């Protein structure tokens, strides 16, 4: 079987974010598990292919065409999309590709190609449908042209794509319910925490720093304002508890000077002066260190396609206080404390409960062991099985 992996993600900012984590781990897992199929990637030389391991790059055949440089500023979006689709379908025909896979289809900075051939199956990974689920909130933040483009992509998925890989059962449920796509293949291929995420590597835990770690941002679904309010309620409700009073809230997210100033002013108004720490963007190594020495993870997101920080926190042995929405209970299982992310008092109570959770070696190890029930190798194997099933539906049987 010949499989073509769409390489657009390599040319976008997403390569350093969650989508990029999925792309790298899934592609490398597929290549490590498969020795019978041929793999291609369409991109341009130097397109961050070095984000993949050298052995993985050696197993990929690069289909190089300037049209695949989606960053080109001299092309309008419609023209770029048409040219990309034409070149892709020509390469599919020319090389006899059996299955094309788009690992990142719905971001506004990538092209979702149309299908012009019946000789190849089209597969796509779906991370979430936030723009539909939280339409009112996102209508304020997206331009009308971006929303129109998103809607057109959804229609194209219904029309041209055969296999849908969903990163959670909840995402699959949202997708089939909202788009009413039942007569296609739907397979759940969950995410996983990276191998570096694990409890502090000594038999005895270090002295726990007095902070709660929050990973999120200024995206409306990340619920940062309510997170601050809930932390303020926690401080007021347990004013006689010296350990709670000594606990800070560590906000891990990218932010500019204006946003930083706004958050600090808001913290001051809530009586949290000196109790809120803003890290800005951090590397994976720095994030790991923050997780390992925190008292718990606070994840009050309104909606997630998966919720990787919950799994990363558990992998580091942390108690987790999480929203009870979307896919998050699916990810945290029985080991997280859940709350209604629209109810500030309930958020504060959930956070307090997580702060009381045991942090002995056995408890941390139990959280870590649970996190490892999600694994990139298994996700890669499930993806490969889905590819084989999908392509097997249309490939002619060989005559002995």
Model-identified regions with their sequence ranges:
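Carbohydrate transferase catalytic cores enriched for Leloir-type hexosyltransferases
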Residues: 1-400
């Amino acid at each position: 079987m010949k499989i073509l992996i769409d390489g657009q993600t390599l040319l976008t900012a997403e390569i350093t974010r969650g989508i990029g984590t999925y792309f790298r781990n899934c592609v490398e897992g597929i290549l490590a598990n498969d020795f019978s199929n041929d793999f291609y990637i369409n991109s341009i030389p130097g397109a961050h292919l070095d984000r993949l391991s050298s052995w993985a790059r050696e197993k990929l055949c690069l289909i190089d065409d300037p049209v695949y440089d989606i960053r080109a500023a001299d092309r309008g979006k419609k023209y770029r999309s048409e040219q990309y689709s034409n070149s892709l379908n020509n390469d599919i025909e020319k090389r006899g590709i059996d299955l094309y896979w788009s690992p990142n289809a719905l971001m506004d900075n990538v092209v979702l190609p149309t299908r012009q051939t019946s000789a190849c199956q089209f597969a796509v990974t779906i991370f979430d449908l936030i723009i539909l689920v939280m339409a009112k909130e996102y209508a304020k933040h997206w331009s009308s042209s971006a929303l129109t483009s998103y809607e057109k992509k959804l229609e194209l998925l219904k029309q041209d794509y055969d296999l849908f890989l969903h990163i959670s059962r909840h995402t699959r449920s949202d997708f089939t319910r909202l788009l009413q796509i039942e007569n296609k293949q739907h397979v759940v291929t969950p995410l996983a925490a990276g191998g570096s995420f694990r409890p502090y590597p000594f038999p005895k835990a270090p002295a726990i720093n007095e902070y709660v770690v929050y990973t999120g941002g200024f995206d409306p679904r990340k619920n940062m304002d309510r997170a601050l309010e809930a932390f303020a309620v926690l401080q007021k409700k347990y004013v006689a508890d010296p350990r709670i009073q000594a606990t800070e809230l560590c906000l891990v997210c990218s932010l500019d000077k204006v946003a930083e100033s706004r958050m600090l002013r808001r913290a001051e108004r809530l009586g949290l002066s000196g109790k809120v720490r803003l890290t800005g963007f951090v590397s994976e190594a720095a994030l790991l260190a923050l997780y390992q020495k925190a008292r718990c993870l606070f994840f009050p997101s309104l909606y997630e396609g998966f919720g990787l920080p919950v799994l990363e926190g558990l992998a580091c042995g942390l108690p987790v206080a999480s929203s009870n929405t979307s896919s998050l209970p699916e990810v945290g299982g029985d080991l997280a404390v859940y709350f209604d992310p629209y109810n500030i008092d309930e958020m504060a109570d959930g956070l307090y409960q997580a702060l009381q959770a045991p942090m002995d070696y056995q408890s941390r190890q139990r959280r870590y062991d649970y996190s490892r029930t999600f694994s990139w190798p298994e996700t890669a194997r499930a993806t490969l099985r889905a590819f084989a099933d999908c392509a097997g539906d249309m490939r002619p049987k060989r005559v002995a």
